[in-house]
Amino acid sequence: MEVNGGEGKVEMGSGLYPDWSELTRECLLDIFSRLSQEQRWIGPMLVSKNWMNACYDPTLNTIFDLETRFLSFPESINWWTPEFEDKVDSFLRSVVDRSEGGLTEIRIRHCTERSLSYAAERCPNLEVLWIKNCPNVTDASMEKIAMNCPNLRELDISYSYGITHESLITLGRSCQNLKILKRNLLPRLGPSLPTIVAPLDYLATFPRYGNIEARIIGKYMTQLKHLEIRYSTLTARGLDSVCKGCSNLEYMDLRGCISLTRSDINTNTSGLKNLTEIIKPDFNPPIAVLRVPRPGNPREE
């Protein structure tokens, strides 16, 4: 390989090819903006220092999405360890720094209070926040999100049991643009339920205040259009609060809400004129049959 007389081309074999190292920063940013975040991590950032620095540009770091990465791997109990959380925290803080406060979307799992508070204090334009499976995120950092990120329009706090109904009040009061809320819980253990990868002691902290959360949602989050509350413990009374308060709902996911009947759902949602899709609980779950051997029957003993 030889460089051809200062013409910005590299001679390889029998042909001449552009010398990509000569591209201006503006050209690099234009090219890299067409790649996903993960594509930049495994490609351009490894080519040269110049390309890596371009990938650090704030305009390329307004969205931090690890959700697709998590989905590409099977669930692991190791994700629930402090060591793994430290790695996720470090990653989030580095992206916050690169964005220079310009982050608008965060989709992450297994972060902690430390990195989320760091993001809340530096990213006032945050609009989308997914923090699923974050046992060490509590009301303290969610209060910072509510106070510092008033433009929040989409929030996913599924399976994060350290976040209580108190956060829903604070977020509802401060984030008037909130349109999407996902507060899904993990299925409780049972023979017909999917396998759950999580520490048993964490599963025991399952939130049991479904009606309280439902009343708060109906009172403070009246602009919601999309609501997911899978496996909530709410009853017909709680669903009534949600439907009366959130009259603009277009989508509801009530899977696993075993305290609701078909009649409860039909009655309470009948007034939601904009509702286009509702996912209901399974009203006919499979029943585990226990076979008890009869004394004296050799085929069953």
Curated annotation (Swiss-Prot):
<protein>
    <recommendedName>
        <fullName>Putative F-box/LRR-repeat protein 19</fullName>
    </recommendedName>
</protein>
<feature type="domain" description="F-box">
    <location>
        <begin position="18"/>
        <end position="66"/>
    </location>
</feature>
<dbReference type="InterPro" id="IPR032675">
    <property type="entry name" value="LRR_dom_sf"/>
</dbReference>
<feature type="repeat" description="LRR 3">
    <location>
        <begin position="160"/>
        <end position="185"/>
    </location>
</feature>
<feature type="repeat" description="LRR 2">
    <location>
        <begin position="134"/>
        <end position="159"/>
    </location>
</feature>
<keyword id="KW-0433">Leucine-rich repeat</keyword>
<dbReference type="Pfam" id="PF00646">
    <property type="entry name" value="F-box"/>
</dbReference>
<feature type="repeat" description="LRR 4">
    <location>
        <begin position="231"/>
        <end position="256"/>
    </location>
</feature>
<keyword id="KW-0677">Repeat</keyword>
<feature type="repeat" description="LRR 5">
    <location>
        <begin position="257"/>
        <end position="282"/>
    </location>
</feature>
<feature type="repeat" description="LRR 1">
    <location>
        <begin position="108"/>
        <end position="133"/>
    </location>
</feature>
<dbReference type="InterPro" id="IPR006553">
    <property type="entry name" value="Leu-rich_rpt_Cys-con_subtyp"/>
</dbReference>
<dbReference type="InterPro" id="IPR001810">
    <property type="entry name" value="F-box_dom"/>
</dbReference>
<dbReference type="InterPro" id="IPR036047">
    <property type="entry name" value="F-box-like_dom_sf"/>
</dbReference>
